[in-house]
C-alpha cells in the first residue's frame, strides 16, 4: 500500500476597487436498562461551563485607487462553507444506525487516526497489536506487534492507548500506552518504517513508566491536546476504593490526568502545569477514555466508577489547571469515603448514571462529521449494558444527557476519525460507524 500526504495550499487574493470585510470491567451481570429516549439527569453541584467567544469586528479595508475596467481581474475564490452550528437538543435517533465497518479484530479497545489525510483508521488490539483499516478493509499485516512485551495478566491490562504526533507526516512518531510483563504502565514512542503501513518494531523509546500496585485501574488513554502536549490518563492503581488514597495524593501520578512535552526526550514539564510536575488534574478513579473536542478544545473525561455511579467530567478549553474531580471523597456527585478539606473545590460530573443502568462508562467523542443534526453531541456508552448516550448543552447552558441507542454490544470505546465521524468498538471484534438509515 502506498499513502500520499495531502498538502494544502492557501492563497490570499486582493481585488482592488472592492471593500473587504473580515467576518468574523469484568463480565457483566444482568442489569436494568432504560429505554431509548430516557433522560439521564446531569449531576448536581459545581460544573464548569464553556464561555462564549465574542466575534471580533474588523474595520473596512482601504478601497485604494480606481482601476481600469478593461484590465483583467483575478478570479475570486468562493468562501469556505461555514461549519454547522452545534445543536442544543439531542437528535431523534430513529433515523440513524450503527453500521458495521469491519470485523475479525482481536479485542479492539481503541481507534484513532494519524491526522495525515490518508483516511486510515488505526485500531488498538488489547493483546498488543495495532491494525489498519484502509478503505473499509482490515489490512492483514499489523502496523505494530508488541505482544512479546505486553502483559495482560488482568482483564484491564494490555495495549491500551495510541496517539500520533501532530507532526507525524514529518517525523513519523507515534506513542503507545501499555502494561508490561510486570504489570506496570509504559508510555513509549515508536516511529514508522520506510513502509508507511509498518512501524519500526525496534524503534521503541520509553518515555514514562509507572509502577502499578494492582492489576486494574490502569487508565490507558494517550492523546495529543490542542496545545501540542501529550495527555495521559492514569487510574488510581486499582483494588477497590483507592486503598492507598492515590487519587488525592499529589505526590504520586496515579489517579491523575498528566500533561507532558515529548518533543524533548524523555519529556519535559510544560510551564503551565499547576504543581510543577506532570499533573494537570487529579481526583480520578479510572479515566479509561477522554477526548478533546477537535473543534473547541473542550475536554470530556469518562471516569469509571466503583459500585454505584459512572460519570462524565468536563472542562472548558480555557479551564484553570489543577482541577480536582473528587475521587475518592466522591463517586460521581455522591459522598464515598472521608470528608474533603473545607477549602477543597471538587468538580462534579456533568452527567452520571447508576449501576442498575450499567457498570463501566466508555467515552467518548464529540461528533464533528457530516450530519448536521449531531454537531457538538458528545457520545458515550456503557461496556456492560451496551447503551449509548448523547450529551449536549441546551440554549441556556444546561447539560442534557439521554439514552439514544440500545445495543447488544460490549463497548470499550467510542472514537472518531479525522473527518469527525464517530465509531463504536465491540470488544468481540467489530468496528461500527454512526450513519443515517
Regions found by a protein language model. Give the residues of each.
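Ser/Thr-rich, Proline-interspersed low-complexity disordered segments
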Residues: 20, 24-93
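Surface-exposed loop and turn segments in beta-propeller and other repeat-based domains
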Residues: 141-154, 203-218, 264-280, 327-356
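Beta-strand initiation motifs
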Residues: 91-97, 137-141, 194-205, 265-276, ...
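Beta-propeller blade signature
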Residues: 187-195, 246, 250-262
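Acidic, Gly/Ser/Thr-rich repeat motifs that build Ca2+-stabilized beta-propeller blades
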Residues: 28, 65-241, 289-292, 297-305, ...
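Bacterial N-terminal signal peptides that target proteins for export
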Residues: 2-13
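Conserved blade-ending motifs and adjacent loop-strand segments that build the rim/top face
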Residues: 399-418
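Bacterial N-terminal signal peptides
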Residues: 13-21
Amino acid at each position: 500500500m502506498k499513502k500520499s500526504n495531502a498538502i494544502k495550499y492557501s492563497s490570499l487574493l486582493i481585488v482592488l476597487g472592492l471593500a473587504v470585510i473580515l467576518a468574523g470491567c469484568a463480565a457483566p451481570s444482568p442489569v436494568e436498562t432504560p429505554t431509548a429516549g430516557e433522560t439521564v439527569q446531569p449531576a448536581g453541584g459545581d460544573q464548569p461551563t464553556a464561555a462564549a467567544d465574542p466575534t471580533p469586528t474588523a474595520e473596512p479595508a482601504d478601497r485604494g485607487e480606481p482601476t481600469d475596467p478593461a484590465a483583467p481581474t483575478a478570479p475570486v475564490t468562493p468562501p469556505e462553507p461555514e461549519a454547522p452550528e452545534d445543536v442544543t437538543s439531542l437528535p431523534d435517533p430513529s433515523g440513524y444506525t450503527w453500521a458495521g465497518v469491519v470485523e475479525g479484530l482481536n479485542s479492539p479497545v481503541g481507534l484513532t487516526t494519524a491526522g495525515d489525510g490518508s483516511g486510515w483508521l488505526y485500531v488498538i488490539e488489547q493483546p498488543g497489536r495495532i491494525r489498519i483499516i484502509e478503505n473499509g478493509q482490515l489490512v492483514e499485516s499489523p502496523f505494530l506487534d508488541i505482544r512479546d512485551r505486553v502483559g495482560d495478566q488482568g482483564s484491564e491490562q494490555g495495549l491500551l492507548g495510541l496517539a500520533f504526533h501532530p507532526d507525524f507526516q514529518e517525523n513519523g512518531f507515534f506513542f503507545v500506552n501499555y502494561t508490561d510483563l510486570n504489570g506496570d504502565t509504559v508510555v513509549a514512542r515508536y516511529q514508522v518504517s520506510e513502509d508507511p503501513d509498518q512501524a519500526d518494531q525496534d524503534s521503541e523509546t520509553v518515555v514514562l513508566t509507572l509502577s502499578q500496585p494492582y492489576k486494574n485501574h490502569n487508565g490507558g488513554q494517550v492523546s495529543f491536546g490542542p496545545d501540542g502536549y501529550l495527555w495521559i490518563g492514569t487510574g488510581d492503581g486499582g483494588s477497590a476504593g483507592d486503598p492507598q488514597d492515590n487519587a488525592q495524593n499529589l505526590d504520586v501520578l496515579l489517579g491523575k490526568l498528566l500533561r507532558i512535552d515529548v518533543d524533548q526526550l524523555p519529556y519535559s514539564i510544560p510551564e503551565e502545569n499547576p504543581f510543577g510536575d506532570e499533573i494537570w488534574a487529579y481526583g480520578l478513579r479510572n479515566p479509561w477514555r477522554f477526548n478533546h473536542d477537535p473543534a473547541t478544545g473542550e475536554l470530556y473525561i469518562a471516569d469509571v466508577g466503583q459500585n454505584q455511579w459512572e460519570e462524565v467530567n468536563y472542562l472548558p478549553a480555557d479551564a484553570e489547571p489543577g482541577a480536582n474531580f473528587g475521587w475518592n471523597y466522591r463517586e460521581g456527585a455522591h459522598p464515598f469515603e472521608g470528608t474533603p478539606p473545607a477549602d477543597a473545590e471538587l468538580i462534579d460530573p456533568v452527567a452520571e448514571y447508576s449501576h442498575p443502568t450499567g457498570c463501566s462508562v466508555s467515552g467518548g467523542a464529540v461528533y464533528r462529521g457530516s450530519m448536521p443534526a449531531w454537531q457538538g453531541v458528545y457520545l458515550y456508552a456503557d461496556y456492560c449494558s451496551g447503551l449509548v448516550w448523547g450529551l449536549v448543552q441546551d440554549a441556556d447552558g444546561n447539560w442534557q444527557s439521554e439514552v439514544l441507542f440500545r445495543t447488544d454490544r460490549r463497548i470499550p470505546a467510542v472514537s472518531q476519525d479525522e473527518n469527525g465521524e464517530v465509531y463504536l468498538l465491540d470488544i468481540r471484534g467489530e468496528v461500527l460507524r454512526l450513519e443515517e438509515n
